[in-house]
Amino acid sequence: MGVTELGKLIGKEARREVKLEALAGRCVALDAYNALYQFLASIRQPDGTPLMDRAGRITSHISGLFYRTINLMEAGIKPVYVFDGKPPEFKLAEIEERRKAKEKATEELVRAIKEGRRDEVAKYAKRAIFLTNEMVEDAKKLLTYMGVPWVQAPSEGEAQAAYMARRGHCWAVGSQDYDSLLFGSPRLVRNLATSPKRKVGDEVVELSPEIIELDAVLKSLRLRSREQLIDLAILLGTDYNPDGVPGIGPQRALKLIWEFGSLEKLLDTVLRGVTFPIDPVEIKRFFLNPPVTDTYTTDVTKPDDAKLRDFLVHEHDFGEERVERALERLKKAMGKLRTSALDSFF
């Protein structure tokens, strides 16, 4: 879900829209779960239901991952997908709340379909999205067959992706959420795993990749350090404390950080006596020192055409002609990445 309130404070001066091709020659660590949820939400049939194979298994995530990854590689981008591992204990309550909300949305979806309320079907279908273990394994299998590297994070995927970017093994983190900045990524690229067009109300708007640099964010918000950015996010709400501090909006939160300098000082003064479901200092410590692994590679490998055909066409009923055309595109794009000076990739 991410730190959406913090995103509202990040102004245009800290954001830079670019063409996809401007990222050519860059390695980007993509938040795999974030991307898969986007594919499940956006790749749907006219009635709002996801794509499925003949066995009734959802394939929207497979389709989105396959074709979008090829698009990124054709633009010269080297993607590395990072998958979530075990969430921190203090996130479990929030995960349970999300599960209940999805179950409720599923009930509303069934009711809307039965009653023929087609205008509401798409709305509830998106809210009812579940990312199952089978879907995650499908994604990993597909990437392996494509020759695209993926990394299993020990905990939060964005924490691992940010770690890889901090070490210089990737140039940026790719996600719609802002959490990677809190985890220390030097830069975030948004709108990478999305369709270049999105419907907003009755209009279709173009979505360009958007680069947000950590240093630019700190400068624009007049913050001295990443620690202060974390403090600000905790006041506003994160994945671990989505409600933030009741009664404190973005502008007041920013002023409090300017005035008191740290979350700890606020807890000793203005916020003394406030009850928190989760210790905010524990959340801060997690952002500063999350579990990460050094066991990963960013190297691309040769695609396995036979396994891709079997997985996509025979197992999941993708159209054979379209898959063959995509395989040719993949091989050409992969060839450029593998024969270019790979040391130019971070």
From Swiss-Prot:
**Top enzyme category:** hydrolase
Annotated residues for binding of Mg(2+) 2: 177, 179, 239
Q: Name the cofactor(s) required for activity, per the record.
A: Mg(2+)
- Look up the EC number in the record and give it: 3.1.-.-
Q: Name one GO molecular function term.
A: 5'-3' exonuclease activity
Biological processes annotated in GO: DNA repair; DNA replication, removal of RNA primer
Checking SUPFAM superfamilies in the record gives: 5' to 3' exonuclease, C-terminal subdomain, PIN domain-like
UniProt keywords (A-Z) are:
DNA damage, DNA repair, DNA replication, Endonuclease, Exonuclease, Hydrolase, Magnesium, Metal-binding, Nuclease
Record bears the keyword Metal-binding = yes
- Record-linked InterPro entries: 5-3_exonuclease, 5-3_exonuclease_C_sf, Flap_endonuc, Flap_endonuc_arc, HhH2, PIN-like_dom_sf, XPG-I_dom, XPG/Rad2
**Signal sequence, start to end:** none
Free-text comment on the cofactor: Binds 2 magnesium ions per subunit. They probably participate in the reaction catalyzed by the enzyme. May bind an additional third magnesium ion after substrate binding.
Residue positions binding Mg(2+) 1: 31, 84, 156, 158
Summarize the protein's role: Structure-specific nuclease with 5'-flap endonuclease and 5'-3' exonuclease activities involved in DNA replication and repair. During DNA replication, cleaves the 5'-overhanging flap structure that is generated by displacement synthesis when DNA polymerase encounters the 5'-end of a downstream Okazaki fragment. Binds the unpaired 3'-DNA end and kinks the DNA to facilitate 5' cleavage specificity. Cleaves one nucleotide into the double-stranded DNA from the junction in flap DNA, leaving a nick for ligation. Also involved in the base excision repair (BER) pathway.
- Entry's family note: Belongs to the XPG/RAD2 endonuclease family. FEN1 subfamily.
Oligomeric state and interaction partners are given as: Interacts with PCNA. PCNA stimulates the nuclease activity without altering cleavage specificity.
Provide the protein name. Flap endonuclease 1
